[in-house]
Curated annotation (Swiss-Prot):
The lineage of its organism: Bacteria, Pseudomonadati, Pseudomonadota, Betaproteobacteria, Burkholderiales. It comes from Cupriavidus necator (strain ATCC 17699 / DSM 428 / KCTC 22496 / NCIMB 10442 / H16 / Stanier 337) (Ralstonia eutropha). This is Glyceraldehyde-3-phosphate dehydrogenase, chromosomal. The active site is at residue 155. InterPro entries: GlycerAld/Erythrose_P_DH, GlycerAld_3-P_DH_AS, GlycerAld_3-P_DH_cat, GlycerAld_3-P_DH_NAD(P)-bd, Glyceraldehyde-3-P_DH_1, NAD(P)-bd_dom_sf. Pathway: Carbohydrate biosynthesis; Calvin cycle. Belongs to the glyceraldehyde-3-phosphate dehydrogenase family. Homotetramer. GO terms for molecular function: glyceraldehyde-3-phosphate dehydrogenase (NAD+) (phosphorylating) activity; NAD binding; NADP binding. Pfam families: Gp_dh_C, Gp_dh_N. GO terms for biological process: glucose metabolic process; reductive pentose-phosphate cycle.
Length: 336
C-alpha cells in the first residue's frame, strides 16, 4: 500500500524529509503528495536544490504552476495558515508530517485531521496529550491503529534512547545525566538580540551556550521504566550541524569498557542496525554529516569506574531525524 504523505512546514526538517525520501531511493512505499508552506515556491525549490549543510540535491527540482516537480514527480504546493482548511481529504493524505514547530500538541495538530488527513506525526516533542512519543527502533512497536497524533520526539532523544535501551537491558540503568553538545539551530540568533532566555539572547556564532533540553527526561516517555531517572542540559556550540550526546550513568552492577562497548556493538549489528551505528575511528563532528543513523556510538570515548559509566554518541541532528520521520510514518500507517 502506497502511503500518501503531506509535509506541513518546509524548513530544515521539512526539506530534509523530502530529500531523504528521494536520496534514499524511495526505500519506503511513500508518495509525497503535497507541501504546505507560506514561503515562496520558487525560493523553497531553490533551497531544496542547494543546501549549505547537505550539499546539492542529486536530482531535479522545479516549480510547475501550483506544484513542485521533483525528479519528475508532481507535488502539490499550498500556502494555507490554517491546517483545518487544507485539502488533505481531497488529496487522500494518510500521514501529515507536521514540521512547522507551531502545532506541537494533539489539540493543535488535530486540525490536520479536520482537514481530512488520517494521521499526524509531529516533528518535535509533543504535549502530554499526544497518543504516543516514538523513537523508531526503540518503541515503534507500541503504535496502534487508533493512534492519530504522535510525536517523533527530538533529534537528541532519537540519539539517546538507542544508546540507553541495550545498556539498560544488559546492565540496568539506575540513574543518569546527559549533556548534548549541540550545533546551533534557527531558534538562536546570529547577533545579540532580546530573548527571555538570557543565554539564548547571545550570538550563536561566538559562544558555547548552555541551555535547557527535555531530551533526557523524554526517554521516560519512550521507555516508561526509566521515567524520572534521566536528566540533562544542552550546550549549543558554533557549528552548523552534527551534535554529540555525552551520557554518564550509574549501572546496577560493576562493568568494564569492553563489556559496555560489546553491548552496543551487538545492538548496532542486530536489533538496532541502521538506527545505531558503531564507530572506532578517531573522527570529528563533520565526519558524521549526512549520516542517516539516529545515533553513532563512539567506542573510543567510553569510560568506566566500577558502576559509573560514560558513553558518547554522534548524531546528524537534521538528517538522522528526517530519515526517522519517514520510518515512523510507515510504522504509523501500518499500525494494527
Amino acid at each position: 500500500m502506497t502511503i500518501k504523505v503531506a509535509i506541513n512546514g518546509y524548513g530544515r526538517i521539512g526539506r530534509n524529509v523530502l530529500r531523504a525520501h528521494y536520496e534514499g531511493g524511495k526505500r519506503h512505499d511513500i508518495e509525497i503528495v503535497a507541501i504546505n508552506d507560506l514561503g515562496n515556491a520558487a525560493t523553497n525549490a531553490h533551497l531544496t536544490q542547494y543546501d549549505t549543510v547537505h550539499g546539492r540535491f542529486p536530482g531535479e527540482v522545479s516549480v510547475d504552476g501550483d506544484a513542485f516537480r521533483v525528479n519528475g514527480d508532481r507535488i502539490r504546493v499550498l500556502a494555507q495558515r490554517n491546517p483545518a482548511e487544507l485539502p488533505w481529504g481531497e488529496l487522500g493524505v494518510d500521514v501529515v508530517m507536521e514540521c512547522t514547530g507551531l502545532f506541537t500538541s494533539k489539540e493543535k495538530a488535530s486540525a490536520h485531521l479536520r482537514g481530512g488527513a488520517k494521521k499526524v506525526i509531529i516533528s518535535a516533542p509533543g504535549g502530554k496529550d499526544v497518543d504516543a512519543t516514538i523513537v523508531y527502533g526503540v518503541n515503534h512497536g507500541v503504535l496502534k491503529a487508533t493512534d492519530t497524533v504522535i510525536s517523533n520526539a527530538s533529534c537528541t532523544t532519537n540519539c539517546l534512547a538507542p544508546l540507553v535501551k541495550p545498556l539498560h537491558e544488559k546492565l540496568g540503568l539506575v540513574n543518569g545525566l546527559m549533556t548534548t553538545v549541540h550545533s546551533y539551530t534557527n531558534d538562536q540568533v546570529l547577533t545579540d538580540v532580546y530573548h527571555e532566555d538570557l543565554r539564548r539572547a547571545r550570538s550563536a556564532t561566538m559562544s558555547m551556550i548552555p541551555t535547557k533540553t527535555g531530551a533526557a527526561a523524554a526517554v521516560g516517555l519512550v521507555m516508561p521504566e526509566l521515567d524520572g531517572r534521566l536528566d540533562g542540559f544542552a550546550v549549543r556550540v558554533p557549528t552548523i550541524n552534527v551534535s554529540l550526546v555525552d551520557l554518564s550513568f550509574v549501572a546496577a552492577r560493576p562493568t568494564t569498557v569492553e563489556e559496555v562497548n560489546g553491548i552496543l556493538k551487538a545492538a548496532a549489528e542486530g536489533e538496532l542496525k541502521g538506527i545505531l551505528d558503531y564507530n572506532t575511528a578517531p573522527l570529528v563532528s563533520v565526519d558524521f554529516n549526512h549520516n542517516p543513523a539516529s545515533s553513532t556510538f563512539d567506542a573510543t570515548l567510553t569510560k568506566v569506574n566500577g558502576t559509573l559509566v560514560k558513553v558518547s554518541a554522534w548524531y546528524d541532528n537534521e538528517w538522522g531525524f528526517s530519515n526517522r520521520m519517514l520510518d515512523t510514518a510507515v510504522a504509523l500507517a501500518h499500525a494494527r
